[in-house]
Amino acid sequence: MIELVFPDGSKREFPDGVTGREIAAGISKSLEKKAILVEVDGELLDLERPLEKGGAFKILTREAPEALETIRHDVSHILAEAVQELFPGTQVTIGPAIEDGFYYDFAREEPFSLDDLAKIEQRMKEIVDRDEPIRREEWDRDEAIRHFREIGEEYKAQIIEAIPAGEKITVYRQGQWKDLCRGPHLPSTRHAGKAFKLTKLAGAYWRGDHRNAQLQRIYGTAWASEADLEAYIQRLEEAEKRDHRKLGRQMDLFHMQEEGKGMVFWHEKGLTLWRTVESYVRRRLDEAGYQEVRTPQVLDRVFWEKSGHWDKYRPNMFVCETEEGEELSLKPMNCPGHVQIFKFGQKSYRDLPLRMAEFGACHRYEPSGALHGLMRVRAFTQDDAHIFCREDQIEEETARFIELANSIHADFGLERDHIALATRPEVRAGSDEFWDKAEAQMLAAARKAGVEPVIAEGDGAFYAPKLDWVLKDSIGRTWTCGTIQLDYVLPERLGAEYVAEDGSKQRPVMLHRAICGSLERFIGVLIENYAGAFPLWLAPVQVVVATITSDADDYARAAAAELKAKGLRVELDLRNEKINYKVREHSLAKVPVIAVVGRREAEEGKVALRRLGSDGQQILALGEAAEALAMEALPPDLARKRQDGGVQAGLGGEREAG
């Protein structure tokens, strides 16, 4: 007998080998019809699978959040069946569920087209209507390899050969079609529903290795209901409008090209945005007591061997050899260099905590298929810093950093979704006692800063736990930006020491921390969060002075000069074009303020201000407009310093500072 604990806390015993369907049927016929999976002790199982153990037990319907991943996995199998029906001879490889959807990789000489996707999607719906039963089978390893080779599925045979000896080989039959799979799966294709859509085609390499055969990947999305699917498609359409790669070109911020994969060509306006972000973060770090340093871009192999990166990170490093036989690498991380600066000269306990920051340029090899605009690059700059401290300072320093990171993210207009405490991974360094202590320190520090972190089991670095910031943008997407990680290992490896109060030599603890992470990625997030329509302080061009008639050219030049004198970033548009054309063009470039001047404005010493996204305009004296815009364009940290009695002037009169 096995004992199952139901969600209401009740316990019941069942004979060994009972299935989830039988249990559901014993509760009610309606539940049996709606049930698609069961969960036993945290493990999802097919409805028809005999239960081998007891524990916490749940019957899942398609509305259950836990069921969504299995629905997506089933739809990926339905995709594969549809492709093989429509395009005989196509080999299947792998087809997992992923965030928001699924994909399947196919081996086929002729490329799929967008027209093919529509045909495949229609066939998938027909397969759902067939209500094909889905059943799990355990196969003999050698028989499975032989069978898949006989039917021309070489990739499946290779997958089976790579499965560790002793692990069960399971095949799922879906009507007459079959696939190698661990499961679980739904009772039949009907249960997958039709709330799915194929979204795009892409290339992929077998086993993710560019030296292997190239495959064709079909992506799709699947949801529990049509309403959920429609909402997701709307989010996709909104995200497409905000795509930083498209806006980067449209706004003349940056571009990327084949000759420099994963490298960014920053244009003048993009670099202005970069410098604005960097300058703001630099001021905040300076206020928080950080020393800014700079470490070499290229260091000898011996250095990376000492730090441990050569053994653990070599495939991601860019390495070159000199004529003298030196093996050098571009730095993938800044931390070992910071330890060298810490070691220069004797350090005392009185010097701690020592906060060392660097806007450090790093290079890491990423496969070309993984690159994605500013979000995934090979050359990037981190707002990196390392805090060297005593063990008794960990909690205080971590709490201070949490407050700083929260403040900076808020100033950039990014809402915090949550902070995750990533705990010990399965493969890790250090004893359980060490991990107990380190996790408790991070948790206590978070709570000291007024934060209750979400526990991310097993997501910690191999050497220590960490806190990760998960931010939410204006359309509800989440981005991981910011981290703080404990490290006892690197100071030990590289021989960092300080003189303790009793005169003994001690190892400092090292806190790795970043607020933006990669500046490239952070700027990409900002572009998409604001859809390019930045607040005035971030906008690369804050004001364009545009003329209605050439009679106002001299006045426009004087107006632009006055605005620039107030520290504003200004462009002058004296072209012989209609004003509506100019306004439309600068609006597409997301310029937040257009100061329109014509003959009347020139005579009266005024400007007509048009805001991005607004049809109205505000007529102000030039001096008044310059003062108000300059105040509004102050970065948040400088605006706080300019507070006067809790209010500050703006174009809307008085407003709260902060």
Swiss-Prot record:
Cofactor binding summary note: Binds 1 zinc ion per subunit.
Cofactor(s) it depends on: Zn(2+)
EC primary class: ligase
GO process annotations (BP): threonyl-tRNA aminoacylation
GO cellular component: cytosol
Tagged with keyword Repeat: no
Superkingdom of origin organism: Bacteria
Classification via InterPro entries: aa-tRNA-synt_IIb, aa-tRNA-synth_II, aa-tRNA-synth_II/BPL/LPL, Anticodon-bd, Anticodon-bd_dom_sf, Beta-grasp_dom_sf, TGS, TGS-like
GO molecular function: ATP binding; metal ion binding; threonine-tRNA ligase activity; tRNA binding
Enzyme Commission number(s) from the entry: 6.1.1.3
Entries under Pfam families matching the protein: HGTP_anticodon (PF03129), TGS (PF02824), tRNA-synt_2b (PF00587), tRNA_SAD (PF07973)
HAMAP family, sorted: Thr_tRNA_synth
Protein family according to the UniProt entry: Belongs to the class-II aminoacyl-tRNA synthetase family.
Function text: Catalyzes the attachment of threonine to tRNA(Thr) in a two-step reaction: L-threonine is first activated by ATP to form Thr-AMP and then transferred to the acceptor end of tRNA(Thr). Also edits incorrectly charged L-seryl-tRNA(Thr).
Name of the featured protein: Threonine--tRNA ligase
Organism, scientific name: Phenylobacterium zucineum (strain HLK1)
Gene that produces this protein: thrS
